């Protein structure tokens, strides 16, 4: 009897560790699978052309990314340098504009995978807890915006290795330089990424305000903010865009952004699962999570097959706000867990230890089931989006290569996007439809597809004219149509 207790305790602790390890492996595996799927889906279905991506891709093809738009958003230089500029250089060297667009899509959608690889390499925490949270964040947040080429995708990808480097880079000149480069890259991904930069420095505060790593990060932050302000002053946006950017900034944190079908579905799934689990845990405590998950899968199946008529498309743009708001929360939890495991906290954090112990003892399986339910929602909604995008792109191609015409739009070679079936127009992005129509027609459209109610115009007449007259790899026909369109409005 004297040995039974310790042996039983050992088996119990082993079981707890095993369940926690399974949850960890599930999160890591799912995050990595998503990061690979982003690249595969984007390239197979040409998602680099969706929404603003059509304009960015066209700018790459005609080798004018900076002149077309990026000089207006100088605070997002990281995206320009890491994806658009290399693609534009490739077009210049290869003479193949279509291949250049593929290079842009590849580099942009590789960011989540590259971010996870960088985080794994930089993370020195016990159990690589920062890397685990990075995978969790990638799996739960990135599918919300996947497909829309928001610069916050890159910001999210850079945040995690930047967090790991800030906590674990050696206090040497080389280590400080690495922290500076990572925080600078993050800050110049998007204006919203400044929130993530501040968050990283804040996660170091629990080490103590006199801790060398905190002081290093704070000093680097001051330098990064100074550089960001200097660039904004030196390279201001055009007058046309200044007002547009100001209005966009004012609505960035509007709570109405989250009142969309995908967010409601995710919260309803969690709430439904949680409620069913609590009820069944009294009847079958060991398998309540399985039964609750099975019931929710059945409910979701009924919803998707018979009740659902939504497409998570345009809201992918607005949900970039979720990355700004939720990513720092995941980052803070990761940093606290890492510092607790390394015993680097300046003060005891008993509630954190108790929460982690509770997760290991009782919540690993229920959390795993909840995680997979959310993943199921993301998988289905992503599949619906990709399928609808494929049909919409085909419809635009038909118009761009056809003979239908709407001269009232300003030219006999213009055709209205309203000719597209209404159920497909949910994938439309009115300001970039003309650029999409040129690309899908292999840069030689017989018609320029235009949204007649569009009120946002990317190019001025002068910019479009200069590009048309320049020597470019793209045939002049498509560039001429866009020049006419631009000169009619700007």
Name these PLM-found stretches.
Residues 106-131:
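Transmembrane-helix motifs of polytopic, lipid-linked glycan transferases
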Residues 128-136, 155-185, 215-219:
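Short hydrophobic alpha-helices at membrane interfaces in multi-pass membrane enzymes
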Residues 222, 285-298, 339-379:
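Signature aromatic-anchored transmembrane alpha helix within multi-pass, membrane-resident enzymes
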Residues 44, 119-126, 161-171, 202-212, ...:
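Structural signal for the C-terminal ends of transmembrane alpha-helices
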Residues 37-112, 142-152, 184-321, 385-395:
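Transmembrane catalytic cores of multi-pass membrane glycosyltransferases
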């Amino acid at each position: 009897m004297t040995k039974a207790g310790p042996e039983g305790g050992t088996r119990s602790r082993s079981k707890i560790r095993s369940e926690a390890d399974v949850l960890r492996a599930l999160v890591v595996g799912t995050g990595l699978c998503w990061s690979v799927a982003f690249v595969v889906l984007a390239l197979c279905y040409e998602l680099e052309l969706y929404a603003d991506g059509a304009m960015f891709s066209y700018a790459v093809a005609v080798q004018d990314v900076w002149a077309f738009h990026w000089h207006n958003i100088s605070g997002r230089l990281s995206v320009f340098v890491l994806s658009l500029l290399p693609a534009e250089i490739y077009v210049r060297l290869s003479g193949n504009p279509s291949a250049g667009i593929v290079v842009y899509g590849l580099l942009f959608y590789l960011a989540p995978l590259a971010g996870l690889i960088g985080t794994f390499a930089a993370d020195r925490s016990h159990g690589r807890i920062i890397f685990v949270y990075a995978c969790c964040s990638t799996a739960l947040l990135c599918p919300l915006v996947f497909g829309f080429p928001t610069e916050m995708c890159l910001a999210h990808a850079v945040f995690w290795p930047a967090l790991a480097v800030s906590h674990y880079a050696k206090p040497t000149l080389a280590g400080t330089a690495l922290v500076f480069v990572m925080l600078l890259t993050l800050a110049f991904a998007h204006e919203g990424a400044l929130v993530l930069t501040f968050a990283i420095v804040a996660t170091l505060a629990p080490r103590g305000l006199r801790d060398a790593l905190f002081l290093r990060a704070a000093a680097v932050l001051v330098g990064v903010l100074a550089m960001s302000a200097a660039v904004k002053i030196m390279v201001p946006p055009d007058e046309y865009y200044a007002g547009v950017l100001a209005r966009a900034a004012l609505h960035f944190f509007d709570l109405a952004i989250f009142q969309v079908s995908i967010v409601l579905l995710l919260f309803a799934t969690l709430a439904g699962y949680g409620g069913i689990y609590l009820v069944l845990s009294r009847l079958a405590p060991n398998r309540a999570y399985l039964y609750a998950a099975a019931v929710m899968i059945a409910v979701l199946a009924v919803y998707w097959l018979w009740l659902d008529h939504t497409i998570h498309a345009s809201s992918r743009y607005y949900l970039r706000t979720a990355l700004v708001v939720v990513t720092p929360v995941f980052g803070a939890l990761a940093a606290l867990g890492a510092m607790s495991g390394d015993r680097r906290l300046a003060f005891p954090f008993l509630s954190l230890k108790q929460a982690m112990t509770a997760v290991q003892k009782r919540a690993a399986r229920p959390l795993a089931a909840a995680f997979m339910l959310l993943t199921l929602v993301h998988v289905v909604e992503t599949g619906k989006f990709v399928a609808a995008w494929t049909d919409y792109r085909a419809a635009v191609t038909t118009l761009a290569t056809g003979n239908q015409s709407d001269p009232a739009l300003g030219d006999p070679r213009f055709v209205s996007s309203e000719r597209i079936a209404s159920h497909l127009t949910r994938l439309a992005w009115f300001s970039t439809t003309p650029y999409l129509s040129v690309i899908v027609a292999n840069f030689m459209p017989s018609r320029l597809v235009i949204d007649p109610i569009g009120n946002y115009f990317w190019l001025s007449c002068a910019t479009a004219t200069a590009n048309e007259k320049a020597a470019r790899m793209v045939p002049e026909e498509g560039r001429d149509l866009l020049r006419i369109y631009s000169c009619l409005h700007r």
